Structure formats: C-alpha cells, structure tokens
C-alpha cells in the first residue's frame, strides 16, 4: 500500500492469544516457596539419611558444657571426643554461653539437634530479611525465600549445620542491632552476643564509627553484666576463663587447617608453622585495616548501614586468629548487598557477588581439606598453601573494590 507516495511495509498479524513471556527471575520468584521447602527437606534428608551427614560436634560441646555446670569446677575441663578422637573438643566459649545453653541438656539430644536445625533455617531467613530491610527492599519476601533456599547450601551454612553451630543467630543479633535506632536495644543485642561468643564484639567498631556512643556504652555494660552473672554462677571457672584461657588459640583448634580462613591461618600454611601474630600476619592485617577504612569512607560509613557492618565484619574475620568457615555467615548478606545494594549497578559488583557465591557453593576450603593428611599438619605444597588464602584474597578484593569503585565509575 502507498501512503503519500511511500510504499509501507507489510504488517503481519499480531498474536493476542499467547501469554507474554515471563522473565526467568519472575518464574523463580513464583516457585520460591516450593524451592525453599525442597531445600529444607533436602538439608534434613542429608542430615538423617546420608552417612556422616552431620555430626553436631559443636552442639555436643554446647550441651555437654552446660551439663558440666552441675559438676563443680568441671566446665573448662570438659571435652567432647566421641566423634573427634584426633582433637577432643573443649568448651572454648565464655561461661555465660554455658548458662544460656543450660536448658538444652535437659532434653534428649536428638530433639535438641532437630530443633537446632530448624532454628538455623529460621535465623538464616531472618538474616536475609533484615539485610533486605537495611537495603530498603523489605517487600521482596519471595526473593528472601530464594536466598534462604540457596544460602542453606553455601559453605558457611553447610558447616553450621554439620557442626550445629550458633553463628547464624549471632549474625542475626548484630544485624538487628544495626537496624534499630534504639541505643539500648543495639547495646543489649551486641553485648549478649559477645557474652555468648566473643567474635560479635567486633561490631563495636561499627557503632564507634557511626558515633553511636550510647549503644557502645550499653553494649560494653551488657557484656560486663554477662561476665558478672557468670562469676556469680560458676565462680572460679569464670575467673579461669578470663585470666588463663582467653586468647589461647591452640585450645580453640588447629591453626593451619584449611578451614581457618584468617590471616594467621593463611600465613601459617605458607610458612609451614604457626605464624602467631608475627610480622607477615601483622602486615596482612594492616593492609586489610587500611582497605576497610577506605571502604568505610567510600560508602559514607554508617549512611549505608548494611555496607558499614559488612566492612567491619570482613575485617574482623581476617583479624581473628581463627575464623572457621562457619564464622563466614556474613558472606550471605555480603552477596545480597553486592547484587542488590546501592553499589550493585557499578562495574565489578556482579562479578564479586557471583564470584563469592561460586566460592561458597563449591566450598573451596572444604575441598582443600581433602589434601591435608590431618587437621594438625600445617605444612603443605606451595600451591595448596596459596590456594588456602581464597577467602582472604577475596576479602581484600571486595574491600578494595568498595574503596575505589565510586572513583572508577566517575
């Protein structure tokens, strides 16, 4: 046909009967509830149907240590060795943890283990939801289900389930402390978390950087209150922990195993002996501290609350003498922040986010553990030693990217 002297193109018939194509992300979100249920059932099946699916050794320590409170002077003499003959596991936590866990020893262990697993899943979902809230994405419940379903199979969560660890609950407590503006609630949550396990105390750096002085003071007061309660309940054992055992990394576990993803662990594997806090370890910590400070400033500190606590937590993980893979639960909110947060549109964010996801789903430190004859042997071939820096190097890359990505985008 001609219109004003021009020949128009033929227009084909428009199909109005076929439904529009649904994006893959939307299809996944529709399936989110089912995928979450399948993931949970698969995890429970792994625990109960696969030989050695989970040994709950740390949960045994929690329960056994709590039970030891009934025997005077026995808390820090207690060890669990039924499934770990090469390393009898002592109770390495503050005495307040034994008081908190005390009711657990009144129940059959099988019941405790099942409830514990459900609690881990609920806490993981809580971590995801609070992370979303901190990014202003609280309406995305189905996305939260997907992250929970996927997170169950990342290495930090796999080892949490295997050992029956408590770290997911502690991460949730710190995130809730960051998300609330109530100074007393922030202080209460951080203080209690640090009273159960010392590692959450690093969150105090976030509140110092955010100049939330009341929260800092309250968290310190609550922590010392847990010490006081412990002193009243277990007396000499509390004194023994805080004057003799605190800081004894050898008592916590083998420094050189690939599961220890801290600077001290990584440098020790390269040197072939425990590096302690020697020059190389201090240099590594110093470099990380500088990158963390630059990253903190780049995101405006506590203006990005999730980004801020992630920067602090990454620094704390490599600073600690021992950071087992189950300590790295912080990688779940980190991946969410990289892929959905305020910097997600910048070049490199998706590479880091998907890169962390690949590392944690593969479980690189776990794979490397098969190449070490025992957990106590520190020395190993150079390529395995350097490969054992995987989380540390990825942390440096992440902090460096946060520190300089905005400049690069400008």
UniProtKB/Swiss-Prot annotation:
Membrane topology according to the record: Multi-pass membrane protein
Chief subcellular location: membrane
Residues spanning the membrane: 31-51, 96-116, 160-180, 188-208, 214-234, 276-296, 306-326, 328-348, 351-371, 384-404
Gene Ontology BP, a term: glycolipid biosynthetic process
Catalytic class of the enzyme: transferase
InterPro entries noted in UniProt: GT87 (IPR018584)
Location(s) in or outside the cell: Cell membrane
Role summary: Catalyzes the alpha-1,2 addition of a mannose residue from polyprenol-phosphate-mannose (PPM) to a monoacyl phosphatidylinositol tetramannoside (AcPIM4) to generate a monoacyl phosphatidylinositol pentamannoside (AcPIM5).
Similarity remark: Belongs to the glycosyltransferase 87 family.
Protein name: Polyprenol-phosphate-mannose-dependent alpha-(1-2)-phosphatidylinositol pentamannoside mannosyltransferase
Species: Mycolicibacterium smegmatis (strain ATCC 700084 / mc(2)155)
